[in-house]
């Protein structure tokens, strides 16, 4: 998600966008007299009557924001199609194999480093992911609550087809332009070490240092950049991120990748997955979507070298909380946190494991289920992460084995009356060996940018995006999707944004009855394309915002359709679906 505007009330928070929405809707109603009936009549079709006003408001909102966008000028980030160059792209393995090479073994290297400079107060840094009213919408970094890391694994299947690198950053998102810049720094190294791909993900924490530029010193930079764009003076626009910090950021990730490759050890890979139930996940702001991925998916790499540290790779679909959010009357909301992901890693580290993390399809799906006493906002994600970490360690254990292990069975927090012991009724799952087969394919995709808010944001140059111009005001964002096969049965889709779970596994919002536009989604789900056990790695090699079904897309600015304001546009999901169909051909 590009941004979330939040304020707190007592010990909770609500979206400040409600206030903004009320103001916008007041303006809309002034301009919309007589327009709603006409629009509703034209587009009603199978739409429910209750949805007609929302659809009409969405049309009006797009029109009004579109008028603002029309007044803004393109900058050097907008490149005509004939001049467009997409460099530093890796295609993956040249060929796919179905059998492991004779005598082949997995090889994995791991590294993890902090992305927080020791002298962080000397930089111009802000928390990426929310703006707080009590902090004048500028959450400058003043303290470090835990850490912000990049975790890296280098993985090779022994087939001679090269090593794939995967890096996950504790941040709101890393834009494709920055990712390709990091790849560029590693071009020679990649050739020398036969790297077939370099893939960079984000955990999507909302309390990390802003690595995109949207959550900057908005009172200073936003007005200046907007005015400069309107006056066609793009050279006067200010970068959203701190340039010196970004150089530090690039260098740390580059070094971590090199360290992971250098530390590769041969060993065995196993896989286990367990459904932990809906208690630990909840749909916060996309009620039309009904699918929920409630599984923990764990890869465990055990090196042959007994002195080397094993590595756990975890995939789960839970949007991080806002660990650094201002709470109460004290001066806070300025703390960097890796959110629940950091505390999963802390727990696995105590048990003797390295940790790697991939988020899943997280559009609207937040953490929940753990109830412990909290003094600060960060305590909630910490409690959640530590408990999830213990579950990850226990996938193949019985309830009796867990109870006998004090580390696993003892809570790391003071439980409230509502707390339910996580291992009650726990049953183990079977762990299977993963044959050393790693196929990976990446593909460039052009997404048409129909959302005027995103077009305008690109023009004010706060985010590092390269926009392809195919015609007059015909804008596209070129990014990547990916497909991975591990062993003979595990299939993974790499998605460059916050993916609606219905689009992965099927759900009500794909149907005419369950969608706001009253028609079926015309694309295929990931299950349709790859099979029912497909795994999603989200925010992969880009952070393009929300990806929601075309038939459930309307920019009405209300709570149920908040995601549309931060989506590239109405055809993003169908474009993605078609691209995934192509990638498996």
Located regions from the model:
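Short, Lys/Arg-enriched N-terminal segments with co-localized hydrophobic residues
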Residues: 1-15
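Bacterial N-terminal signal peptides that target proteins for export
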Residues: 16-24
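Hydrophobic alpha-helical targeting segments used for export or membrane insertion
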Residues: 25-29
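Hydrophobic alpha-helical membrane context
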Residues: 30-31, 216
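Sec-dependent signal peptide cleavage junction
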Residues: 31-43
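Conserved beta-alpha junction segments in alpha/beta enzyme cores
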Residues: 42-201, 205-383, 396, 406-585
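Glycan-recognition surfaces in beta-rich domains, encompassing non-catalytic CBMs
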Residues: 392
């Amino acid at each position: 998600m590009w941004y979330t505007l939040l304020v707190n009330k007592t010990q909770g928070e609500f979206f400040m966008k409600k206030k903004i929405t009320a103001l916008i809707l007041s303006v809309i109603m002034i301009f919309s007299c007589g327009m709603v009936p006409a629009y509703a009549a034209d587009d009603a079709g199978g739409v429910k009557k209750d949805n007609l006003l929302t659809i009409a408001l969405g049309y009006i909102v797009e029109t009004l924001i579109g008028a603002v966008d029309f007044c803004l000028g393109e900058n050097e980030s907008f490149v005509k199609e004939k001049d467009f160059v997409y460099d530093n792209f890796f295609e993956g393995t040249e060929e796919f194999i179905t059998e492991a090479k004779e005598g082949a073994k997995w090889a994995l290297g791991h590294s993890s480093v902090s992305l927080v400079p020791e002298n962080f107060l000397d930089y111009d840094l802000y928390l990426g992911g929310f703006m707080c009213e009590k902090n004048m919408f500028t959450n400058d970094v003043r303290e470090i609550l835990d850490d912000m890391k990049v975790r890296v694994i280098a993985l090779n299947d022994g087939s001679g087809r090269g090593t794939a690198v995967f890096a996950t950053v504790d941040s709101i998102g890393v834009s494709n332009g920055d990712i390709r810049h990091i790849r560029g720094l590693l071009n020679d190294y990649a050739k020398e070490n036969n790297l077939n791909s370099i893939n960079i993900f984000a955990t999507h924490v909302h309390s990390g240092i802003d690595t995109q530029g949207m959550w900057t010193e908005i009172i200073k930079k936003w007005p200046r950049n907007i005015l400069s764009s309107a006056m066609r003076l793009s050279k006067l626009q200010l970068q959203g991120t701190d340039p010196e910090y970004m150089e530090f950021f690039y260098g740390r990730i580059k070094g971590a990748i090199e360290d992971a490759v250098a530390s590769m050890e041969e060993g065995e890979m196993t896989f286990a997955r367990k459904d932990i139930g809906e208690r630990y996940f909840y749909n916060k702001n996309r009620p039309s979507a009904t699918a929920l991925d409630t599984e923990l998916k764990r890869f465990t790499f055990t090196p042959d070298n007994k002195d080397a540290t094993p590595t756990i790779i975890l995939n789960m679909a839970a949007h991080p909380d806002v660990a650094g959010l201002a709470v109460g009357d004290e001066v806070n909301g300025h703390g960097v946190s890796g959110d629940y992901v950091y505390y999963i890693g802390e727990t696995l580290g105590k048990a003797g494991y390295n940790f790697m993390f991939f988020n899943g399809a997280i559009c609207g799906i937040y953490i929940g289920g753990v109830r412990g006493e909290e003094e600060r906002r960060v305590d909630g994600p910490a409690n959640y992460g530590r408990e999830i970490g213990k579950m990850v360690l226990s996938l193949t254990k019985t309830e009796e084995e867990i109870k006998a292990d004090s580390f696993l069975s003892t809570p790391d927090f003071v439980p409230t009356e509502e707390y339910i012991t996580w291992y009650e009724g726990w049953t183990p799952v079977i762990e299977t060996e993963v044959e050393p087969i790693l196929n990976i394919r990446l593909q460039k995709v052009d997404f048409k940018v129909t959302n005027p808010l995103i077009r305008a944001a690109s023009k004010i140059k706060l985010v590092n995006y390269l926009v392809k111009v195919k015609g007059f005001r015909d804008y596209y964002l070129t990014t990547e999707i990916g497909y991975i096969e591990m062993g003979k049965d595990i299939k993974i889709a790499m998605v460059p944004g916050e993916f609606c779970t219905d689009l992965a596994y099927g759900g009500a919002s794909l149907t005419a009855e369950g969608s706001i536009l009253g028609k079926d989604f015309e694309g295929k789900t990931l299950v349709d394309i790859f099979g029912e056990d497909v795994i999603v790695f989200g925010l992969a090699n880009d952070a393009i915002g929300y990806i929601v079904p075309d038939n459930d897309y309307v920019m009405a600015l209300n709570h149920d359709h908040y995601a549309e304001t931060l989506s590239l546009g109405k055809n993003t999901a169908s474009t993605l679906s078609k691209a995934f169909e192509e990638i498996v051909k």
